[in-house]
Regions:
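Non-catalytic, charge-rich alpha-helical accessory subdomains
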Residues: 89, 94, 98-179
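Switch/coupling segment of Walker-type NTPase motor domains
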Residues: 1-103
């Protein structure tokens, strides 16, 4: 860092992407780079309030991109070497996630296309095991979508997810929230 990265960055002669896990490089030369006209951005996964953000929704161009995002998210959050005895839960959770991401991609304004909104939708999908007639705000959202566009791709995945019992749906939601 001291003899390679800092001297090269301080020459200010090109754009940089610097891995700085300790934050010492940005602390030591971030101000210099900003004074030279650089836009310094930090992705800090520990202190998110001090971090610039990454929103994968910005890069979703088509349905295949959505599928790939969900698949990669599940792969990235599965511990190495672990295998589920029953893949049903991961498959069902990915169907729910696909429904939510497709809904946001095609129906939400750009500022609501993000993972915090996915979590908000997930929380809106409250399931009551003792009341089969209960309709959650998320159910209402997809009911309205069905009235407007019964062939919507998000609706197809939501129907697949929603075909289980209340107890099963609750377990699927917990599986997804844990990811």
């Amino acid at each position: 860092t001291r003899f390679f990265c800092k001297p090269n960055a301080m020459q200010c002669n090109t754009s940089f992407v610097i891995l700085d896990p300790k934050g010492e490089i940005v602390r030591d030369i971030g101000g210099l780079l900003e004074n030279k006209g650089y836009e310094v951005r930090v992705l800090d996964l520990i202190n998110m309030h001090r971090s610039h953000c990454y929103n994968p929704f910005v890069y979703l161009r088509n349905d295949n991109d959505v599928q790939r995002l969900v698949t990669n998210l599940f792969k990235a959050t599965t511990p190495k070497g672990s295998q589920s005895q029953d893949p049903f839960w991961d498959t069902a959770a990915s169907m729910l996630l696909l429904a939510l991401v497709f809904y946001l991609k095609y129906e939400a304004p750009p500022d609501e296309q993000n993972f915090p909104m996915v979590m908000e939708l997930l929380r809106a999908g409250e399931v009551r095991e003792d009341d089969d007639s209960y309709v959650s705000p998320l159910d209402e959202l997809f009911d309205r979508l069905e009235m407007v566009n019964p062939e919507h791709i998000a609706l197809k995945y939501y129907r697949d997810y929603h075909s289980g019992s209340a107890k099963t749906l609750k377990s699927i939601q917990i599986t997804l929230a844990a990811r």
